[in-house]
Amino acid sequence: QRMAAEGHQIGTHSYDHAATGGGNGVDMTRQSPEKQIEEVQMGQQAIADATGSEASKVFRSPGGNFHGEIIWNLQPYITSEIGWNVDTEDWRRPGADAIAERLLSVKPGDVVLMHDGGGDRSQTIEALKIALPQLRAEGYKFVTIDQLLAYDDAKALAQELASQQAAE
């Protein structure tokens, strides 16, 4: 509820991440169309139940496995599938400095993969405390996926955010 109240965009990543591969890892493309749809709908419902508001229709498939028929199967239930181009690998727990270093490698328009569940996330939290002030000092602003997708390309977003910062 706090995250929703703060304006974070909350979308599903599937309902049962660990079970999405049916023994084949986290690959929804190996599931039946019915199971793929069920995973998305149950995830969206869990978010709605927890936050009191509708989940975003943006979806990120576990492991980034999103290809083939899954696009067609989920089309009525999602507006877009989002991937990432900077993986902090925080799920490996390599230490806060290593996570922060990966986070600091971003460029305007990048989508960063980080995790907030699955056990001890103290390294991720510490890395954010290190990296976010530096990124803000460099002029970065943080936007939701919907805000990012509203732009034709990341360059346009970077230019607009830079002009907004100059005006402040």
Question: Which role fits each region the language model picked out?
Answer:
Residues 122-168:
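C-terminal domain-boundary segment and adjacent tail
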Residues 1-117:
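Metal-dependent polysaccharide deacetylase catalytic core of the NodB/CE4 family, i.e.
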